[in-house]
Amino acid sequence: MSQFNNVTLVKAANVYFDGKVSSRTVQFNDGSHKTLGLMLPGEYEFGTQAKELMEIMSGELQIMLPESHTWQSIVGPQSFEARESPDNCFYFQFSRHAWCYLI
C-alpha cells in the first residue's frame, strides 16, 4: 500500500529513545488503526503486548525476535511478524533511517 486515503492522523507523537524513534497513529473510517513510525540509526529493544505485523517501507535493519537467537536482515520494502511477547523483547539494529508501519 503506497498511501492511506480517508484517514485521521493523530497529531500527538509517541516518542521513544530520546526522540530517535517516533510514531503517529493513523485511524481509518472502519475503526481500525495503524501506527506509522520513523526510526533513526541505532540499537533498540521493544516488547509487544499483541501480535504485530511490521512493514518496513524503506531502510535497512537487523532484528532478533524472542524465539530466535540469530539476527535477521530486513531491507525495505519487507515485513515480519512479531508475536505477543510481554515478558520478552525483540531487538533492532538500524544502519539507515527506516520508515515502517504496524498493523
From Swiss-Prot:
Main enzyme class: transferase
**InterPro entries registered for this protein in UniProt:** Ppnp (IPR009664), RmlC-like_jellyroll (IPR014710), RmlC_Cupin_sf (IPR011051)
Family, according to the entry, reads as follows:
Belongs to the nucleoside phosphorylase PpnP family.
Known role: Catalyzes the phosphorolysis of diverse nucleosides, yielding D-ribose 1-phosphate and the respective free bases. Can use uridine, adenosine, guanosine, cytidine, thymidine, inosine and xanthosine as substrates. Also catalyzes the reverse reactions.
Q: What is its EC number?
A: 2.4.2.1, 2.4.2.2
Reactions accelerated catalytically = a purine D-ribonucleoside + phosphate = a purine nucleobase + alpha-D-ribose 1-phosphate; adenosine + phosphate = alpha-D-ribose 1-phosphate + adenine; cytidine + phosphate = cytosine + alpha-D-ribose 1-phosphate; guanosine + phosphate = alpha-D-ribose 1-phosphate + guanine
Report one GO cellular component. Answer: cytosol
- Could you tell me what this protein is called? Pyrimidine/purine nucleoside phosphorylase
Q: Is Glycosyltransferase tagged as a keyword?
A: yes
Instruction: Name the UniProt key words of this record, in alphabetical order.
Output: Glycosyltransferase, Transferase
**Pfam families given for it?**
Ppnp
What is the top-level taxon of the source organism? Bacteria
**Which Gene3D superfamilies is this protein grouped with?**
Jelly Rolls
Q: What GO molecular function annotation could you give as one example from this UniProt entry?
A: purine-nucleoside phosphorylase activity
Q: Which gene encodes it?
A: ppnP
Say if the entry is tagged with keyword Membrane.
no
Which species is the source of this protein? Shewanella denitrificans (strain OS217 / ATCC BAA-1090 / DSM 15013)
